[in-house]
């Protein structure tokens, strides 16, 4: 889920930045420190939206930098359990498919792709339903539910998000439309 959070921190402004626009300098320092980082409690920081408040700076003996207490807004993405997501399939491998969820990728294990036995076609990089003939491949758009989350502090790479498409109205968007049309025809 995307959120705007208000965060308080202390920013170290080096002496070479004195005399420049303080708000712009603080925002630049915050962007370098936070943007693109993953925090288990906050989520994945996408952008520093605004610097709301900058307190009076204090100079520490022997340092020369000014330390300013600041309050700022940031745009974050934090995956939540049971959240419904839509995303693009960015990779298909023998054990499942990876779906882009904004700044992170989630894995749909082969057992969670569809209610059918499936096989992996390495030439097409696709997962194919044996009875239904349904195909899931790179570039397809899907709707899925988050069923497990393991975020590693500071590391996007070690984080894992597990997804399922084995619930009503989840799956490849084409499959969902076909299911809706079939139900309407039955009525």
Curated annotation (Swiss-Prot):
It catalyses: RNA(n) + a ribonucleoside 5'-triphosphate = RNA(n+1) + diphosphate. Forms 2 domains with an elongated structure; Rpo4 packs into the hinge region between the 2 domains. SUPFAM superfamilies: N-terminal, heterodimerisation domain of RBP7 (RpoE), Nucleic acid-binding proteins. It is an enzyme of class 2 (transferase). NCBIfam families: PRK08563.1 (NF006333), rpoE (TIGR00448). It is found in: Cytoplasm. Its EC number is 2.7.7.6. InterPro entries: NA-bd_OB-fold (IPR012340), RNA_pol_Rpb7-like_N_sf (IPR036898), RNAP_E/RPC8 (IPR004519), RNApol_Rpo7 (IPR046399), Rpb7-like (IPR045113), Rpb7-like_N (IPR005576), S1_domain (IPR003029). DNA-dependent RNA polymerase (RNAP) catalyzes the transcription of DNA into RNA using the four ribonucleoside triphosphates as substrates. This is DNA-directed RNA polymerase subunit Rpo7. GO terms for cellular component: cytoplasm; DNA-directed RNA polymerase complex. Coiled coil: none annotated. Residues 82-166 form the S1 motif domain. Belongs to the eukaryotic RPB7/RPC8 RNA polymerase subunit family. Keywords: Cytoplasm, DNA-directed RNA polymerase, Nucleotidyltransferase, Transcription, Transferase. Part of the RNA polymerase complex. Forms a stalk with Rpo4 that extends from the main structure. It comes from Methanocaldococcus jannaschii (strain ATCC 43067 / DSM 2661 / JAL-1 / JCM 10045 / NBRC 100440) (Methanococcus jannaschii).
